[in-house]
Amino acid sequence: MCEPAPPKPTQSAWHSFPECPALLLLLSLLLLPLGLPVLGAPPRLICDSRVLERYILEAREAENVTMGCAQGCSFSENITVPDTKVNFYTWKRMDVGQQALEVWQGLALLSEAILRGQALLANASQPSETPQLHVDKAVSSLRSLTSLLRALGAQKEAMSLPEEASPAPLRTFTVDTLCKLFRIYSNFLRGKLTLYTGEACRRGDR
């Protein structure tokens, strides 16, 4: 007598992910730095406070580690970074598109700065392994943050400014050490990025 054919595998295990928010969040955080999409991941993943907190903690850890770095943490040239100071009165009076543009441009410039720092460290005469690891992690994190902001609609809002609106040029300055670069990175995440995402997420919940 022929035995019955085994049942076909189902997708129930995979479809159970949306029923486990904590597991889905963990999977999203693991795959985001690799640039891999996560089936069922919420489009506004950055609205989960734990996500942004993770990147802020990484940035502050990198700043603390490089604070005592005496060798191999100075750059052979100055690197341009965004100004992270926030005038809260001015910020609240800014149009949503202007806020998005300032954050989007700042994140792009910060990404360029970290990449430039990565290249300078790699070409240093005596490269230090620990700072290099933190720079590599920052490069990956900034790519993930860019994807998260794009999913939140920041790029679309930044490009939706009317032609008659002339936003002020992005304020910048330069840094010459890895510690200063990571300090800017940390301040940007805790300041303008947190302010923008907080308001954008609240608007989406209305």
Swiss-Prot record:
Disulphide-bonded residues: 47-201, 69-73
InterPro entries cross-referenced by the UniProt entry: 4_helix_cytokine-like_core, EPO/TPO_CS, EPO_TPO, Erythroptn
Tissue expression remark: Produced by kidney or liver of adult mammals and by liver of fetal or neonatal mammals.
Keyword vocabulary terms for this entry: Disulfide bond, Erythrocyte maturation, Glycoprotein, Hormone, Secreted, Signal
Stretch forming the signal peptide: 1-40
Positions of glycan attachment: 64, 78, 123
Protein name per Swiss-Prot or TrEMBL: Erythropoietin
